[in-house]
Amino acid sequence: MVLSSQLSVGMFISTKDGLYKVTSVSKVAGPKGESFIKVALQAADSDVVIERNFKATQEVKEAQFETRTLEYLYLEDESYLFLDLGNYEKLFIPQEIMKDNFLFLKAGVTVSAMVYDNVVFSVELPHFLELMVSKTDFPGDSLSLSGGVKKALLETGIEVMVPPFVEIGDVIKIDTRTCEYIQRV
C-alpha cells in the first residue's frame, strides 16, 4: 500500500475494478484547504482511460508485478504457447499481448514477461536475436536506389535491410527494438 500522494506516472495500482497504469498525477487544492490527488488511469488490459480522485492521505494498493523468463514453443490458434522456465508450466499468451513482438518469434526464443496474479500483461523480447535469411533481393535490384543495402526476408517472416554481401542461409543479428541489421554471425 502506498499513499495516493506518492503515486507517480508508470506505476500500476490495483482497485476493486481491476488493474490500472498511472498515466498522469496532479495535486489539486480543495475548497476548504484539503488537497486531493487527481489521477488518470489506463486499464492494464485495454486502452480505456479513467480519472479518479483520491484524498492525499488515502492508501492505494500498488500492484507488484513478477518478472518471469519464458521460452517460446509454438503458435496454437490465436495464442502463443510459452514454457515458464521457473516452474515449467505452459502459458498461452494472446495476440493482443504480444503486439508486434510475434514478428521475431521462433521456437526457443527466451523472453521476459510481466505477470500479475498469474496473468501475463506484457512481453519483452531480448534486444538482439539471431535469425536466418530465407530470401534476399539480387544485389543489382535495389542497391542503386538504396545506398548499398538490399531487402532480406528472415525465417520468421520479417523483412529487414541488409548489406549486399548477406546471402540466403546466412544467420544475422537483428536489433529487435529498431528492426535493424547489426552483423552477420
From Swiss-Prot:
Involved in peptide bond synthesis. Stimulates efficient translation and peptide-bond synthesis on native or reconstituted 70S ribosomes in vitro. Probably functions indirectly by altering the affinity of the ribosome for aminoacyl-tRNA, thus increasing their reactivity as acceptors for peptidyl transferase. One of its GO terms (molecular function) is translation elongation factor activity. This is Elongation factor P 1. Its main location: cytoplasm. PROSITE patterns: EFP. InterPro entries: Elong-fact-P_C, NA-bd_OB-fold, Rib_uL2_dom2, Transl_elong_fac_P/YeiP, Transl_elong_KOW-like, Transl_elong_P/YeiP_cen, Transl_elong_P/YeiP_CS, Transl_elongation_fac_P. The lineage of its organism: Bacteria, Pseudomonadati, Chlamydiota, Chlamydiia, Chlamydiales. GO terms for biological process: peptide biosynthetic process. It holds the Pfam family Elong-fact-P_C. Belongs to the elongation factor P family. The keyword Cytoplasm applies. It comes from the Bacteria. The gene is efp1.
